[in-house]
């Protein structure tokens, strides 16, 4: 599902209730937060037809507050990452092993790397190679040449990090990156996420 659908459900049905001052106070009492989360889960399951095996999210980054709540109410979800040029899935992880905030690990027969001196700490472009990667753009050798590195990796245009377990974390788009006056990297996607949580 596209995150906007999930976010719309949470923002219209769940957040108005849990943001009420009385509910916020009750959730601070030990043991009561879990009772409220169970009720939220029950209502969400009912809204989705009574049973959810897995919610697979893709197409855009998920709002952090929505993801936190999905985790808290124990909805089985995962986030996949892909693009048309890669047929389309690049990374995914089973819900039982999924790391919050990530888009999973490279799928079978695909390799991902971060074009960075330190892919765990310094954001770089996510690059892909594997059986599902396109050969090139139809009748457009210039675009094809620009899309690939000299050693044959597809430039996704997405920026990210990876952890020691090979989970990937998308931070933004290279075309959207703003360099601040002090040299700080500013990702509009992170600002948008914060504004969406207000």
Go through each PLM region and give its residues:
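Phosphate-interacting basic helix/loop segments used at nucleotide- and nucleic-acid interfaces
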Residues: 198
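Active-site activation/catalytic loop segments of kinase-like enzymes and analogous catalytic loops
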Residues: 102
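Short polar/acidic secondary-structure junctions
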Residues: 83, 117-119
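Phosphate/diphosphate-binding loops
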Residues: 190
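Generic beta-strand/beta-sheet core signal
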Residues: 1-2, 55-58, 73, 80, ...
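Conserved ATP-binding/catalytic segment of the ANL
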Residues: 106, 120-180, 185
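Gly/Ser/Thr-rich phosphate-binding loop
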Residues: 1, 5, 9-98, 111
């Amino acid at each position: 599902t596209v995150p906007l659908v999930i976010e719309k459900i949470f923002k219209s049905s769940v957040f108005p209730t849990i943001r009420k001052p009385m509910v916020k106070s009750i959730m601070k009492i030990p043991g009561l937060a879990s009772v409220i989360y169970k009720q939220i889960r029950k209502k969400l399951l009912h809204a989705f037809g009574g049973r959810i095996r897995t919610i697979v999210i893709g197409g855009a980054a998920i709002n952090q507050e929505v993801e936190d709540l999905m985790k808290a109410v124990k909805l089985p979800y995962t986030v996949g990452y892909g693009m048309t040029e890669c047929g389309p899935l690049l990374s995914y992880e089973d819900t039982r092993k999924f790391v919050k905030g990530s888009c999973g690990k490279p799928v079978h027969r695909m390799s991902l790397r971060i074009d960075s001196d330190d892919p765990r700490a310094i954001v770089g472009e996510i690059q892909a190679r594997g059986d599902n990667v396109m050969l090139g753009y139809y009748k457009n050798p210039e675009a094809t040449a620009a899309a690939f590195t000299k050693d044959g990796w597809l430039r996704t245009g997405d920026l990210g990090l990876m952890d020691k377990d090979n989970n990937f974390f998308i931070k933004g788009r290279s075309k959207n990156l703003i360099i601040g006056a002090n040299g700080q990297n500013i990702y509009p996607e992170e600002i948008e996420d914060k504004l969406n949580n207000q």
